[in-house]
Amino acid sequence: MSEIKVGENESLENALRRFKKKCARAGVLSEVRKREHYEKPSVKKKKKSEAARKRKFK
């Protein structure tokens, strides 16, 4: 879990902006979207190979 320490003179908006940036860098939101619904292992494997194919032909 991402944590930030809020300074004494720091506004809530600045602290929230730093927290959101830290979460984005840690990949929290993408992980949540990925785990939102169960995905069968065969589907995961298929998506992974499709992504590799797209990267290869790009």
From Swiss-Prot:
<comment type="similarity">
    <text>Belongs to the bacterial ribosomal protein bS21 family.</text>
</comment>
<dbReference type="GO" id="GO:1990904">
    <property type="term" value="C:ribonucleoprotein complex"/>
</dbReference>
<dbReference type="InterPro" id="IPR018278">
    <property type="entry name" value="Ribosomal_bS21_CS"/>
</dbReference>
<feature type="region of interest" description="Disordered">
    <location>
        <begin position="32"/>
        <end position="58"/>
    </location>
</feature>
<feature type="compositionally biased region" description="Basic and acidic residues">
    <location>
        <begin position="32"/>
        <end position="42"/>
    </location>
</feature>
<dbReference type="GO" id="GO:0005840">
    <property type="term" value="C:ribosome"/>
</dbReference>
<dbReference type="InterPro" id="IPR038380">
    <property type="entry name" value="Ribosomal_bS21_sf"/>
</dbReference>
<feature type="compositionally biased region" description="Basic residues">
    <location>
        <begin position="43"/>
        <end position="58"/>
    </location>
</feature>
<keyword id="KW-0689">Ribosomal protein</keyword>
<keyword id="KW-0687">Ribonucleoprotein</keyword>
<dbReference type="Pfam" id="PF01165">
    <property type="entry name" value="Ribosomal_S21"/>
</dbReference>
<protein>
    <recommendedName>
        <fullName>Small ribosomal subunit protein bS21</fullName>
    </recommendedName>
</protein>
<dbReference type="GO" id="GO:0003735">
    <property type="term" value="F:structural constituent of ribosome"/>
</dbReference>
<dbReference type="InterPro" id="IPR001911">
    <property type="entry name" value="Ribosomal_bS21"/>
</dbReference>
<dbReference type="GO" id="GO:0006412">
    <property type="term" value="P:translation"/>
</dbReference>
